[in-house]
Amino acid sequence: MNIKSLLLGSAAALVAASGAQAADAIVAPEPEAVEYVRVCDAYGAGYFYIPGTETCLRVHGYVRYDVKGGDDVYSGTDRNGWDKSARFALRVSTGSETELGTLKTFTELRFNYAANNSGVDGKYGNETSSGTVMEFAYIQLGGLRVGIDESEFHTFTGYLGDVINDDVISAGSYRTGKISYTFTGGNGFSAVIALEQGGDNDGGYTGTTNYHIDGYMPDVVGGLKYAGGWGSIAGVVAYDSVIEEWAAKVRGDVNITDQFSVWLQGAYSSAATPDQNYGQWGGDWAVWGGLKYQATQKAAFNLQAAHDDWGKTAVTANVAYELVPGFTVTPEVSYTKFGGEWKNTVAEDNAWGGIVRFQRSF
């Protein structure tokens, strides 16, 4: 009887202990649902939604390596060897929809390195050098844009062809702080007005004028454009508040076929000197022209020619060949004739130069 009671008591104690341990056990919570990154196709390829928001983000950019030889076609100086330069450009774009329109941002950081034999390439620095620059940083809401961007005087009419040495005869400075508004109509018509701080020295210009405004009065830029399936025509006028002079450009683009297009641009400056922010060509006027021929799906031929009032003539041609998607090799040759008033500014009247660019865009 005692043994039976002992066994029953032990069993009861074990059951009670097991029940107590079960009551004290920690219950693991259910795992939260994983929120995968969603693709956003509202603003083009490469965007995705930032988790937990309705803002779309894209990370993109390029890696570039340039090898240059011959003369510097901007200054006429003999390089006496190869100049090499590399750049990593990191771009970040965002976009979202608001009750006031599309809200966008764009930033670009450039990490540059150069090993120049002659130290003549001001775009990357002299001798062996490296540096980082914030090239773009702007906010755009609808047609309103504020921040660091390129001047509307340069971009509204379009760049000077798809060549690397496109600004041997400069059509104006590039980077500036600005507030601009662009109106875009549904019939191909657009207009822009911009208040700008003044540009930097990215255009190959070597004068001494301080481009930035020296008071509260900004530089003012305005332009009109009409674009259709045949091409476009655009005009832009800029007032330089530092020297109190103005400059203007008119450009036309024509699409001959789907593969072949041509363009022509003329400019005039009231200052008649390149020592200014906008009219950086020599003399009163300058003219540029060019063409592009998409020979194959991978290869494109580009040509640009320019001439200014002081007698400088520049011609550049290249072939941009896409080896594989995202990787393009571009051999280019350029010629500059320093005639007229430009003769006194250079050691040689003629300059021949070449460059090969390797670029991976992503």
Swiss-Prot record:
GO terms for cellular component: cell outer membrane; pore complex. The keyword Membrane applies. It is found in: Cell outer membrane. One of its GO terms (molecular function) is porin activity. Keywords: Cell outer membrane, Ion transport, Membrane, Porin, Signal, Transmembrane, Transmembrane beta strand, Transport. InterPro entries: Porin_alphabac (IPR003684). It is a multi-pass membrane protein. One of its GO terms (biological process) is monoatomic ion transport. Residues 1-22 form the signal peptide. Homotrimer. Belongs to the alphaproteobacteria porin family. The pore formed by Omp2a is larger than the one formed by Omp2b. Omp2b pores have optimal permeability to allow growth and protection against harmful compounds. The larger pore formed by Omp2a may be advantageous for intracellular growth, when the bacterium is competing with the host cell for nutrients whose concentration is particularly low within the phagosome. Forms passive diffusion pores that allow small molecular weight hydrophilic materials across the outer membrane. Consists of 16-stranded beta-barrel sheets, with large surface-exposed loops, that form a transmembrane pore at the center of each barrel. The pore is partially ocluded by a peptide loop that folds into the pore lumen. This is Porin Omp2b. It comes from Brucella abortus biovar 1 (strain 9-941). The gene is omp2b.
